[in-house]
Amino acid sequence: MSELCSVPRVSERFAQSNALDEDIARLKYVSGKREEALRRLGIRTVGDLLLHIPHRYLDFTRSWSIEMAPIGTVCTIIATVDRIVQKQPRPRMQVTEVSLVDETGVLQVAFFRQPWIAQQLKQGDRLAVMGKVEFAYGFKQMASPHFEKLEEGRAAGTILPVHYVSDGVSQAWMRRIVSGALEVVGNPFDPIPARLRVKRRLMSNARALRSIHFPSSMAERDIARRRLAYEECLYLQLALRLRNDGGLVDVVPYAHTAGEHLAALKQALPFSLSDEQEVAFQDILRDMCDGGRVMNRLLLGDVGTGKTAVAACALAVAADSGTQACVMAPTGVLARQYADKTGPLLSQAGMSWALLTGATPAAERERIHAQLESGELDVLFGTHAVLSDDVAFKHLSLVVIDEQHRFGVGQRNALRAKGPGADLLVMTATPIPRTLALSVYGDLDTSIIRHRPVPGAGVTTRVLTESSRDLAYGAIREAHAKGQQAYVICPLVEPSDSADELEDVPGIARDDEGRVTVPVPLHDTATELDRLRLALPGLVIERLHGRMPAGEKDRVIDAFKRGEIDVLVSTTVVEVGVDVPNATVMVIENGERFGLAALHQLRGRVGRGSVSGTCLVMTHSKGNGGASAAQDRLQSLEKTSDGFTLAQMDLRLRHEGEILGYRQHGDVTLRFVDLDADEELIEWAHLDAVELLRYACTLDSVATRPLRDAVATRYRHIFKEVSGG
């Protein structure tokens, strides 16, 4: 451990470290209004301020003359204001045109809906503008670039940070405040052990913070970002692992043994496990049979890759060991499907099981409770209902959670608490890039199944515009003529629902506050139900959405499974778990509203039987600007059926939290890590976190306490679960 952690000796540097926790109100230049503005940005402490890094830089070391600035490229140009003209080409459209000149030419700059700029600038002002250079009407032009008035005598070879600011704090004042904060903090003790900094070739924390805000070169900025990204990843890995292990310090892991139930279950399966499935199961079996540690494993698999069969094998191992297992799913639909598909296999293997949901009748619920407490039941399938205080197991040794990201951490821990020392297996059919899995599931060992054990008929995907709607209706009619069924997916439930309740997806223009700024017709299930009943007479069409009572949802899904409904108009409630092999067509309205991973999950509902499926993604994109980008993104669905490839594309375009649904259920937002480019760095942080905790399981020693404190400060919301806060 001595190689990893050096004991701090300089008390002054600890005092400077504590300065990071000081309230921003104590900083120089932070007045009442500026304090309010900073707090609106989520900045409450000096540490928050220093982690509020620039989102771009004005690089005067690489500025261009107007003549040499390349067209189609984002450039920084330093020039002088020659003329300012305000125009109003149409109602509510104000344009401020600024002509900039240097010794080589003229640059026409247009600012839209920013009339105050005319009051901020005057002829003769020296500006630095950064934006994309275009050419039209004989002049080079920029549209709404970022600009900075240069102070008299400013050196041309500097780099200016550009922060996100709020009313009450200008860019200039933000720089002054950040500079003052860096002075207050000085050169604090670095929580990351010196051994790791040398091993990973990282600059110190203090230097990284200075360099990320005020770099002398963009290369220095990149080195600083690398240090802060590693720090972010390491802290997150440690926080997640400490949280996961915090309640397990005094428990004794259970050493399972495989036996007759497992052998019988494998015989009952309609197919042999594929090589990938077998590797994943052996990972799980090794963990379950290890009496020295509790299993914490993520089983990650694309749609139809057979995760359920692997999980069933784990359930059999628990039964072979004379203990119980619980499978928790996010919806009653999915829990019932697990019971319907897996239950008969368990019965053939000599295991007893039951299903418990919110809709379970009281008498049945009492019977299940009694069988659990007596040990008569081997496996319980259920929803959040299994978390009820009156659900008690005789000996719960395995917890399986499906679609982990749809549950809060507290729910996961509550179920696990019903069996101290229970192994944990979480599963998801949402393809997640490896870097993202290592980051946000850093507390879990990962097994991946990429390919289907039994190749299905497949799905053909086409992206259609509104003008091709007849093709979509024709596909539904053709499927119906063959005795097959269809889904129509809408982003909204009712016409009154707000567009701004939806996730922010590339391709839709929004203003700075996230509001939709272009008129995009949004489809809702209520209106679509009426429209389809008119367009497709003679077909039985019903709708399904998450606001329906559980019993009503079950009724509709059962009717669809029995073939009594021809077309199901639904929200994304069918994204996970609805398995109707006779459904062969899916039409997704407003495809630009969904991420690639979600679209891939949705299309996985068709083509599940012996007949190939058709997925038609409707878009209102017109082929220009952001709409063109949205259409390009959607067309990648036509080119690949690999969910992991699509997830990697999604990661480049969207926030990691949007892929996993973390806006409601998650722990983290990664501000420094580039999940697409930092794979090696993320791997380092993962390995280093494991090594640190191997030698100091709680980071509570004198040598590691500063690191633990830094982790607790950065990820308070995660770490408080370790201390019981």
Question: Can you say where each PLM-predicted feature lies in the sequence?
Answer:
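Long, highly charged, low-complexity intrinsically disordered interaction regions
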Residues: M1-K28, E36, L236, G246
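Upstream accessory/linker segments immediately N-terminal to the RecA-like ATPase cores of bacterial MutS
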Residues: R34, I71, K87-A268, Y662
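OB-fold nucleic-acid-binding modules
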Residues: H52-D82
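Short, surface-exposed secondary-structure boundary micro-motifs
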Residues: T80, K132-V133, A239, G591, ...
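N-terminal pre-P-loop "Q-motif" helix
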Residues: F271-M295, A309
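Inter-lobe coupling/hinge segments of SF2-like helicase ATPases
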Residues: D290-Q635, T698
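Accessory helical-bundle/CTD segments and flexible terminal tails appended to RecA-like ATPase motors
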Residues: D558-P581, M586-E589, G604, R608, ...
